[in-house]
Amino acid sequence: MDIDPYKEFGATVELLSFLPSDFFPSVRDLLDTVSALYREALKSPEHCSPHHTALRQAILCWGELMTLATWVGNNLEDPASRDLVVNYVNTNMGLKIRQLWWFHISCLTFGRETVLEYLVSFGVWIRTPPAYRPPNAPILSTLPETTVVRRRGRSPRRRTPSPRRRRSQSPRRRRSQSRESQC
């Protein structure tokens, strides 16, 4: 059975396959990131989001896979066979778990739409012949920023800028910090 773990999130395995394998951080770095950013939400008995649920399941599966790999490593007599198993797990399973964790962490951090836009942008960039594409690949953290191009001609009338709230004091941010839920 061929199951695409990204389907319900609007992405596909193919869409993530445009990103090279060395793009994804190590399992250790991803676990550290998840722990630093989402530990409370992942441990919470509340349902936070489908991304939290997917991360919980993927972390549990990785733990079970590491238990199995340890058992195989301890019980397989032939060193060549043991190395084959370890290399297979690290190369194939490790890449899949790194992709999965990166996707869900990125969706929680930047938003699903931004991540999908990034995947499409990167896919277009990587498939464009080098002579016709910009030298640098798109960067996920800069995607939400938009460039405003002014028309030529009359300059817009000048106004005194209105006082603005600092971002960190916005009501939305305050509300989310004061909520009792960890999500």
Swiss-Prot record:
InterPro entries: Hepatitis_core (IPR002006), Viral_capsid_core_dom_sf_HBV (IPR036459). Residues 155-177 are annotated as: 3 X 8 AA repeats of S-P-R-R-R-[PR]-S-Q. Residues 136-183 are annotated as: Disordered. Residues 149-176 have a biased composition (Basic residues). Residues 177-183 are annotated as: RNA binding. Its main location: virion. Phosphorylated by host SRPK1, SRPK2, and maybe protein kinase C or GAPDH. Phosphorylation is critical for pregenomic RNA packaging. Protein kinase C phosphorylation is stimulated by HBx protein and may play a role in transport of the viral genome to the nucleus at the late step during the viral replication cycle. The keyword DNA-binding applies. Keywords: Capsid protein, Cytoplasmic inwards viral transport, DNA-binding, Host cytoplasm, Host-virus interaction, Microtubular inwards viral transport, Phosphoprotein, Repeat, RNA-binding, T=4 icosahedral capsid protein, Viral penetration into host nucleus, Virion, Virus entry into host cell. Sequence repeats lie at residues 155-161, 162-169, 170-177. The modification Phosphoserine is found at S155, S162, S170. GO terms for molecular function: DNA binding; RNA binding; structural molecule activity. It is found in: Virion; Host cytoplasm. A motif (Bipartite nuclear localization signal) lies at residues 158-175. GO terms for biological process: microtubule-dependent intracellular transport of viral material towards nucleus; symbiont entry into host cell; viral penetration into host nucleus. GO terms for cellular component: host cell; host cell cytoplasm; T=4 icosahedral viral capsid. Homodimerizes, then multimerizes. Interacts with cytosol exposed regions of viral L glycoprotein present in the reticulum-to-Golgi compartment. Interacts with human FLNB. Phosphorylated form interacts with host importin alpha; this interaction depends on the exposure of the NLS, which itself depends upon genome maturation and/or phosphorylation of the capsid protein. Interacts with host NUP153. Self assembles to form an icosahedral capsid. Most capsids appear to be large particles with an icosahedral symmetry of T=4 and consist of 240 copies of capsid protein, though a fraction forms smaller T=3 particles consisting of 180 capsid proteins. Entering capsids are transported along microtubules to the nucleus. Phosphorylation of the capsid is thought to induce exposure of nuclear localization signal in the C-terminal portion of the capsid protein that allows binding to the nuclear pore complex via the importin (karyopherin-) alpha and beta. Belongs to the orthohepadnavirus core antigen family. This is Capsid protein.
